Curated annotation (Swiss-Prot):
Provenance organism: Dictyostelium discoideum
Subunit comment: Adaptor protein complex 3 (AP-3) is a heterotetramer composed of two large adaptins (delta-type subunit and beta-type subunit), a medium adaptin (mu-type subunit) and a small adaptin (sigma-type subunit).
Start and end residues of each MHD domain: 178-420
GO cellular component terms attached to this protein's record: AP-3 adaptor complex; clathrin adaptor complex; cytoplasmic vesicle; endosome membrane; SNARE complex
Gene3D superfamilies for this protein: 3.30.450.60, Mu homology domain, subdomain B
UniProt-recorded name of the protein: AP-3 complex subunit mu
Entries under Pfam families matching the protein: Adap_comp_sub
Amino acid sequence: MLSSFFIIADQGDILIEKHWRGLMNRSICEYFWDQVLQSKQNGSSVPPIISTPKYYLINIQKQNVYLLGVCQSEVSPLLVVDFLQRIYDTFVEYFGSNITSATIKENFVHVYQLLDEMADNGFPFTTELNFLKEMIKPPGVLSNVISSVTGTSNITDILPNGSLGAIQWRKTGIKYTQNKIFFDIIEEIDCIIDSNGYIVSSEINGEILCHCNLSGMPDLTMTFNNPRMLDDVSFHPCVRYSRWENDRVLSFIPPDGNFKLLSYRVKGINQFPVYVKPQISYSEGSSSVGRVNVTVGAKGYNVQNKLSIEDVVATIPFSKTTSSTNLTANIGSFGMDEQSKILRWNIGKIPKEKTPFLNGTVSLIAGSMTPESTPSIMLQFKIPQYAISGLTIDSLACSERYKPFKGVKCTTKAGKFQVRS
């Protein structure tokens, strides 16, 4: 599968390199970084799969780092992408959600220890987080002090309890004074809306995250209000797939701590919580001027249901020939990057008493051609305590004698939410 693995910083520096099938020349990373720079110049994202005469370069970008897998022969691309994502998720659990170049450098030893356990000869081997945490202790001030004083390693010498059993993701003998389990339903909206407000394409990508603090070996059964609407469902290994196929019921023995229970897609969504009305046009002439009028607001049913639409940001990529702007906004703040000519309008929380708008003019460089097309607006937002698909958890039964405390939280946010002007 993987011949080599690299972690590359956002400036092109190689932070981590791991080789399983012979030492690979670093020039392959230079070739990859050239592709990244070329994609940035074109205003696009780097392709996840890059083919070269000798290798296949498969990558994911996360925050300020790139995870790059190099394969010498054809493999299933999704398998490699999923493995790279699993590596990144493991780093997040060990080092925190903000994975930067500094984070990787500070936890250099732990990164290599995790890679040694997670892959065997380039193939995924141990990827279950709870199992890894039993073998490699997460970094911390206390653990570092103990290791330096006693001279002991943070890697255990014996296999964790239950590692050779059928339920490898959960160790035996877990006890809590307070038994509780929480679920987060997080849904992202990916859609394209044309200039007339009609939906060109739309889908929801959702996931259910779980935080489990239950004693013993609990066997849980979960039911949903409308499980038939879920497409392309991907489960944690703890879920009994046959039970889902037959009854659309989730039956599982959960890992201890945090884990992703499942991910899914929902298609055919035709109503969104926010609307964008963009009007961007350019006049013909030697000194072309563009008129801008963009309105962002909440749909009426959201106001009635008292939903809170927060962290709203509208991004407008203007023409490279734009020289200056004369814009005003009644809510929030905005600014344009002089190099990329991308305007970012930070609205924040949409108020219920008035509608945010941005209007004014943009001027083009003298003698430049009028843009052939108007820009598409990318919108970001977050709605707490709301699942746009309508998915809810109807019931959760536990096989243990105790009665656990249960909680569910929903969040809807924008993924690739594009509105054409």
